[in-house]
Amino acid sequence: MQIPRSVGTHDGSFHADEVTACALLIMFDLVDKDKIIRTRDSEKLAQCEYVCDVGGRYSIADKRFDHHQVSYTGSWSSAGMVLDYLHHLGSLPHEEYEYLNSTLVHGVDEQDNGRFFSKEGFCSFSDIIKIYNPLEEGGNTDKEFFFALHFAIDLLTRLREKFRYDRICRDVVKQVMEKEDVCLRFDRPLAWQENFFSLGGENHPAAFVSFPCSDQWILRGIPPTLDRRMEVRIPFPEDWAGLLGDQLVKATGIPGAIFCHKGLFLSVWDSRESCEEALNLVLKQQGVV
């Protein structure tokens, strides 16, 4: 007899793919956390409503998500299989599916299937999950598995929150892009950069963006492309580089000057008015106005 809202996965050492697969099923309220059964016993697995990363079968209809069998020739791990299943159910709109896949799940699939290895000095999500395994081999790993599971659930929850927030910001960015040319002016800090380029920003004439941050204002140069995000279309004057407070006030002649990054892509001002004054000064020096 099948146990409703249960999921089976293998015991022993765990990896990011089955941890992520279980986290997704829990997040979308398809299984209960206390009905995760970690085993390789085929009879026990047969009682589970869902089975991930064990069992030698991939079947959406039967809710079986293993990728180790020779008959499976796709590129997913159990994480990618479950994400696709949620998309197939209609629980994940296509845009959110693509977002979760590109930000996290695809990387899990690649690393689990041996197509990606982290370079020295870099630590991926999959590397972090692996670290939660017991240091000594052969022990009971349930405690550590559930610790890693909670971490994955928290991360996926935050990613979904960020996705929704970014989509709200995109509407604001679109409106500002339609009415501004040289500088995108925002009344609040928001996720502008990726949205700007996803909306055709490479061909937009804006060179700067301004917005409040706490009780100050930021004036930032816009990169030519998202891949070249540490560059800017129009840099601040070289003699502003790394200056603070009175030094920047002296260099700019603007009393509200606070800071200019040594990379000449970001500056901080004490008010909207000072920020606008700095913008006009830079544009004038560059011959834009």
UniProtKB/Swiss-Prot annotation:
InterPro entries: MYG1_exonuclease. It holds the Pfam family MYG1_exonuc. It comes from the Bacteria. Belongs to the MYG1 family. This is MYG1 protein TC_0665.
